[in-house]
Regions:
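Catalytic-core signal marking the mid-to-C-terminal active-site face
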Residues: 435-461, 479-588
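Phosphate-binding chemistry for phosphorylated carbohydrates and sugar-nucleotides
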Residues: 84, 101-102, 147-483
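Short alpha-helix plus adjacent loop in nuclease-associated cores
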Residues: 102-115
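An N-terminal, well-structured beta->alpha segment
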Residues: 1-81, 86-92, 114-132, 140-193, ...
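Short, highly selective alpha-helical patches that border small-molecule cofactor pockets
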Residues: 71, 75, 79, 203-206, ...
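Conserved phosphate-binding/catalytic loops in two-lobed NTP-binding clefts
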Residues: 90-104, 251
Length: 588
């Protein structure tokens, strides 16, 4: 009932070189093969140099687990493996850092923060390193690392970033950018967000985060007294900053069973856990997955069916989903606006990375509004890489809600420099200008300054290592508040998704299919792509630009995945059936 996720030495997803080494270890059948695989793995490991002479090296291994009972036993076995690996390498010490029950993105963050703490330590000690005692220097280094890689440091980063992002703007509260935003801004906060935590560790993490908000306000050093046990079905947490209703905790059933973001996104309906089945209706809702790295928003509006009255009248439900595509749109458009207000639109490039599974309505909406996009192969590591390589600020979310916004180091430097320059200019202007002129100039400068501060707060609200559902909830809630408590319905209505259908076809050998153009086109077997193109033109006098279909092999089993998109569900069904038949004909 459990599995293993491995984080690379920088806090990112595991690279292909590591994947190959891990496969060699798992598939080793003899002791000689295992030794060879371990040698291959060791060659790729980054070690922490803990002395100037490089006489000592330490392999640091971070561990975390979710709320499943088997987790504790598996972690202990993994620790044994880490120590054994260190024992076969002379001069290498193994330091175990067990962070207990954490989300997957939290573990990514700890590894990321470890590296940043080491970089900062040696940068700050360049001049004093010659004079310092070596043992004292090493102790000081580990103190810095330990402080940076605790869960309190993680939660504090996100909480402080969010509080900075939503800091009240009294001028906007009174006037707003327009009448609608002005009226919305008078509300203290958004309506409560009901979060389906997939019976997983996200429930525990959200409770700890919420407890910290009050602690930060009180400038206290510990949040233990305000934490609650994460075992109940529902927990309601309301503060001045945010209102969350947490549902589906660790004791409510197996992780992801009939709940979680994957269930909601694929089935287009609310979680079906017995205790919470009806409680999502007419609410603002979100769903995370068991690892707490994916996020989708949804809403279910319920009312009486037209023409029926009385107690026995049936209810008609309208399910609305904001998946990864709409998360990308909201975040990207918000950041574009802030870059424009900050005067940085010409200095910092911004775009969206997506996969072939993104809805065609999404890509057309981006094109219509001048937002640059790039399509990558399926898989979060591929989309992450595309966002990183193509843009200074790359926003990416797979359709399932796994993603984030990546700020390059250069983009962060530009924003920070512009912020310092703007503060300096404001100070000079206020001393040089006359009183009546100063007021006019300060309004212009304040608009720019607020945008720069908003960008800085956004950076801090985001987990810099990987897509993180907790970070994403805070960012989305912050953006909706900054946009005058924007209603879910308005966000959802930015564009209308085209009907889609996804199916699987069993084949003898999935490797006969080769794809290109980010898996949107089929190269082999020869003739299959031509047949798909012909199917898309069936029953149509002219080419229908809303029709789209592609096939790709599964990465783990002998099946071919089929994706079809069309203007209506009936056409979608018809095309899907014909494409499936073509796959069977060409692949078997």
């Amino acid at each position: 009932d459990n599995g293993l996720k491995i984080v690379d030495g920088h806090g990112n997803v595991l690279g292909e070189a590591y994947e190959h080494a891990c496969e060699m270890i798992c598939n080793a059948k003899t002791e000689a093969q295992l030794e060879n695989a371990l040698d291959c793995f060791e060659e790729k490991l980054p070690f922490l140099e803990t002395s100037r002479e490089d006489a000592k090296k330490t392999a640091v291994v971070y561990f975390g687990r979710d709320t499943r009972e088997s987790g504790e036993r598996l972690v202990e076995k993994a620790k044994e493996g880490a120590r054994a690996l260190g024992g076969r390498s002379s001069g290498v010490a193994v330091k175990i850092c067990d962070r207990g029950v954490v989300t997957t993105p939290m573990l990514h963050y700890f590894v990321y923060a470890h590296g940043k703490a080491v970089e900062a330590f040696y940068e700050n000690n360049k001049q004093q390193e010659e004079k310092n005692d070596e043992d004292a220097t090493e102790r000081s280094l580990w103190e810095k690392i330990d402080a940076a890689t605790q869960e309190l440091a993680y939660f504090k980063r996100l909480a402080v970033g969010y509080l900075s992002l939503i800091e009240e703007d009294e001028e906007k509260k009174k006037k707003g950018k327009n009448v609608v935003e002005g009226l919305r801004a008078n509300a203290t906060t958004l309506p409560p967000l009901h979060i389906d935590c997939a019976n997983g560790v996200g429930f525990v993490a959200f409770e700890k985060l919420m407890a910290l908000f009050d602690v930060i306000r009180e400038n206290s050093s510990s949040s233990e007294n305000s934490r609650r046990s994460a075992t109940t079905t529902t927990t309601t947490t309301t503060t001045k900053e945010i209102a969350l209703v947490l549902k589906n905790g660790p004791n409510d059933g197996p992780v992801n069973l009939n709940c979680g973001s994957d269930f909601v996104q694929k089935n287009q309906r609310a979680p079906e856990t017995p205790s919470t089945r009806l409680s999502f209706v007419n609410q603002r809702c979100a769903s995370v997955d068991g690892d707490c790295d994916r996020l989708v928003y949804f809403s279910i509006e319920e009312g009486e069916e037209e023409g029926k009255e009385g107690e026995n009248s049936s209810k008609k439900q309208n399910f609305m989903l904001c998946d990864g595509d709409k998360l990308s749109i909201l975040i990207a458009f918000f950041l574009i606006e802030q870059l424009f207000l900050a005067g940085l639109a010409h200095k910092i490039s911004l775009g969206i990375a997506h996969t072939a599974y993104s809805n065609g309505a999404f890509t057309k909406f981006c094109e219509k509004n001048g937002v640059e996009t790039v399509c990558a192969k399926t898989g979060v590591k591929n989309v992450h890489k595309a966002a990183e390589e193509h843009f200074d600020i790359g926003v990416y979310f797979e359709s399932n809600g796994h993603g984030t916004a990546l700020f390059s180091d250069e983009a962060v430097k530009v924003i920070e420099k512009e912020l310092v320059d703007e503060l300096t200019r404001m100070s000079v202007e206020q001393h040089l200008r006359k009183e009546e002129e100063k007021h006019i100039q300060s309004v212009i400068l304040t608009t720019k300054l607020k945008a720069l501060l908003t960008l800085k707060a956004t950076i801090q609200t985001i987990n810099p290592a990987i897509g993180d559902a907790i970070s994403s909830v805070l960012l989305i809630e912050g953006i909706l508040r900054k946009k005058g408590n924007m209603p879910f319905q308005e966000w959802h209505a930015m564009y209308r998704d085209l009907p889609t259908k996804q199916t699987k076809v069993k084949v003898r050998d999935r490797t006969v299919i080769e794809c290109f153009d980010s898996e949107r086109k089929c190269l082999k077997p020869e003739g299959l792509q031509q047949r798909i193109d012909e199917i898309l033109l069936l029953d149509s006098c002219v080419k229908n630009n809303n029709r789209r279909a592609f096939v790709r092999p599964s990465g783990t089993e002998d099946i071919v995945r089929v994706y079809v998109e069309a203007s209506d569900a009936e056409t979608c069904e018809k095309i899907s059936t014909k494409v499936e038949e073509a796959v069977i004909e060409f692949c078997n």
